[in-house]
Amino acid sequence: LGERFCSIQRRHQKILEEGPWLSEEVREELGSKVVAGAEAVGYKGLATFEFLRDSNGDFYFLEVNPRVQVEHTVTEMITGYDLVSIGIRVAAGEGIPINQNDVKIRGHAIQTRINAENPLTLAPSPGRLWECHWPSGPGVRVDSHAHTGYDMPASFDSLLAKVIVWSPTRSDAISRMKAALSETM
């Protein structure tokens, strides 16, 4: 289902994720290796194969996460597939409802995590959200549980929301994300 690129990560959390990133040729080569790896162990379902890429462009296998990840929204935006629904259907024994030849990567998507953190120390910051406004509009998606008046508990993951944008090109997606983040309060 394509690839995502984590451009900023902090404390094992992906802060900024985007896709697609690779050329069609590299995507096909890496994709065939991923499929072969899943087939070799008999895995059927959703998973993220993670790789590190060096300055020469060579990939090194890191790990497989056999689950839907926080940044699955990038893949959903560029493929049009609802990965959570597919994962549930596969787990229920329905099989994978996608033919690999039908998968088309369209446009560019970026996801940004919005965290409840102290802006100076970046430590988690529990407390009340006195005001909360999420962006909206064409090509903008927000996944969140937070709202005005929400009390963020002290024992929590600092994730408040994921702001995801889609546009036909990466430069347009960057502009759309800047606008969406400027709307966020």
PLM regions and their residue ranges:
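ATP-dependent carboxylate activation and anion-phosphoryl transfer catalytic cores
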Residues: 1-185
